[in-house]
């Protein structure tokens, strides 16, 4: 099992640098940051841009893989974004993982104009991923679609990783699952939505795990339909009602249950002092000490 961690882009670099270096030193396999202009309950708090943050993190680390959790077409155009991706892969020495999602409702969805309908959002995401794939696998791309155009778009010399950086496609719905099966080197999910207000936390937690097993089966079906096998499966444990780093026991249980469902990777969040992802640094440090045993957990084999 590989263990990753999200560091929200809220801190000035003087502090953030120490955290990115710490997670590499502790032995995490990958580290991520969100790709938003502002995010949910933190919209009025400090929030920095994704690409320069990842470039800075790449410059002060050596081994750990780095990625977007996740980039979306809410405010990204594939042509300039592909150039950024190519640059990040170069600066990191081929350590970039490109997490991609359709983009949900909220601040980012309407910051540049009217938000798309759910159907439009799915259509746009499909074209976004298709165009990114083309841009990152060939030196010159031309495309004229419903949402995007590219005319002689150059991506030279291309990515360090070949044929391109790995796509980790976040997906829950049928169309996104099909897209992940078609283009992804990895599938990512936060798991199913559960109504935490209507039930006890422990009950909601079990409901989440049951729904996750259903999602896993649906992705298996999407893979079969696409005629591909997506090796890597990433689970954000913090899609569940119980915060992954509420205790070391909670993290251990999450890793073991994720492995039993065939996930190869889990992702947690650096604890915040209050609000979303609230937790204690001592638990993160205990988790860091326990990483070798957690990473020794083997994902269940898939047929």
Regions found by a protein language model. Give the residues of each.
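Active-site-adjacent structural elements that line small-molecule/cofactor binding pockets in enzymes
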Residues: 1-303
